[in-house]
């Protein structure tokens, strides 16, 4: 029997309860990010912040989550998943309590920096755990579907909740939810999340080339999505779509995303990721063309829905490629940081070129980045298959030698 590193380090696959617990903690960690667009407006109106100050607070949250991913990568060779989860939840609780008690711009920045760092730790833990599922793509599809559903519900519910209970109320609720998250920690493994060889080898050089390509692909792909996603409403106005039609499109997007993540993404374990990624890329390119060609609200809604559908349906297949590129799960842990940086970078790039090249440049950036990202994914998937084929050839030679 050929014992791989995976079988030596993890003689038994983690139980299903481990994946459900990690997924639930990951959803909890994304709660603030899901309502950031609403919170920016609330901080501006009720907390007396300027528009740029509210934006800085939101950016602090996102970049703190990236820092949290780095903290998880540092802690994963040293601590168990349970210990890391408890530490991350403690930081989240402190950040949410501090946010509820914030009195000015500076204190709010510090509070969201703390809370975001804790959320980044938990999200990275969630991604590494899902990567070790029997079907990482299907596990991620369920997680992504829950994330989209949370965004839809909270976006609709939070404005009224804040209006009646005050701007501090959501963070008090999140504090309670984070405290309840401690009950899920015993379901996580008591061993280190990394195999022995991954603990000995640290630093960027220890990542397989396939994993590096996959992470770069994720960042590039999400930069394209961020460049277009951020400016969907202005694009609708540019195409003379009534404001009601644009609002309806942005509302229905969540249903399209949910259908993509759960419907198509749930088949990630049955479909070749490379074929699925190419098919969904073609769908996205067609939807981008439609966004800049339609003249009716129905056409705009259909194009925007197809764009978000293909994006959300593609992500589980992308996660499958990432999880296959690195059996230790470290590459998967970087996913929250890479997609967050990609979204922020894409939106920033579009904001620079739009005044000169017009709104159409957002579509070109999205299309070019999507093509480049999927190309890198296919390259990564091809490299990931090569060691497996080499192993099969070695096993065949050994078998022939024994028989001879």
Briefly describe each language-model feature range:
Residues 68-81, 260-273, 354-355:
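Helix-to-loop junctions at the C-terminal end of transmembrane segments
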Residues 325-359, 366:
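A late C-terminal transmembrane helix in Major Facilitator Superfamily
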Residues 48, 101-106, 272, 293-295:
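Helix-breaking motifs and short loop linkers at transmembrane-helix boundaries and internal kinks
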Residues 120-134, 312-326:
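Intracellular juxtamembrane helix-capping segments at the cytosolic ends
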Residues 67-104:
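Conserved MFS/SLC helix-loop-helix module at the cytosolic interface between two early adjacent transmembrane helices
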């Amino acid at each position: 029997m050929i014992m791989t590193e995976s079988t030596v380090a993890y003689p038994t696959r983690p139980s299903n309860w481990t994946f459900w617990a990690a997924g639930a903690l990951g959803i909890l960690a994304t709660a603030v990010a899901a309502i950031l667009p609403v919170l920016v407006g609330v901080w501006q109106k009720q907390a007396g912040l300027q528009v740029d100050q509210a934006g800085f607070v939101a950016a602090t949250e996102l970049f703190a989550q990236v820092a949290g991913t780095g903290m998880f990568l540092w802690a994963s060779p040293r601590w168990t998943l349970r210990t890391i989860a408890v530490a991350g939840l403690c930081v989240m609780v402190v950040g949410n309590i501090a946010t509820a008690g914030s009195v000015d711009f500076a204190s709010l920045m510090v509070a969201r920096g703390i809370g975001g760092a804790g959320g980044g730790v938990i999200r990275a833990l969630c991604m590494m755990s899902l990567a070790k599922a029997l079907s990482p793509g299907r596990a991620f599809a369920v997680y992504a579907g829950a994330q989209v559903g949370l965004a839809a519900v909270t976006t609709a519910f939070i404005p009224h909740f804040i209006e009646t209970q005050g701007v501090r109320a959501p963070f008090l609720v999140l504090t309670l939810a984070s405290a309840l998250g401690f009950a899920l920690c015993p379901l996580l493994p008591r061993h280190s999340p990394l195999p022995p060889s991954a603990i000995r080898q640290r630093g960027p050089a220890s990542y397989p080339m396939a994993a590096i390509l996959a992470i770069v692909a994720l960042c590039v792909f999400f930069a394209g999505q961020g460049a277009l996603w951020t400016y969907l409403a202005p694009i609708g106005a540019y195409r003379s779509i009534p404001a009601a039609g644009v609002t309806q499109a942005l509302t229905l997007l969540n249903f399209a995303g949910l259908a993509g993540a759960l419907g198509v993404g749930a088949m990630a374990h049955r479909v070749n990721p490379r074929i699925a990624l190419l098919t969904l890329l073609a769908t996205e390119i067609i939807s981008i063309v439609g966004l800049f060609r339609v003249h009716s609200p129905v056409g705009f809604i259909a194009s925007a829905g197809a764009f978000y559908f293909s994006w959300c349906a593609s992500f589980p297949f992308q996660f499958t490629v990432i999880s296959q590129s690195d059996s230790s799960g470290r590459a998967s842990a970087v996913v929250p940081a890479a997609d967050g940086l990609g979204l922020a970078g894409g939106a920033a790039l579009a904001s620079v070129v739009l005044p000169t090249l017009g709104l159409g440049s957002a579509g070109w950036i999205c299309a070019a980045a999507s093509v480049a990202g999927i190309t890198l994914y296919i390259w990564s998937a091809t490299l990931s298959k090569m060691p497996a084929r080499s192993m099969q050839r070695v096993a065949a030679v050994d078998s022939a030698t024994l028989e001879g």
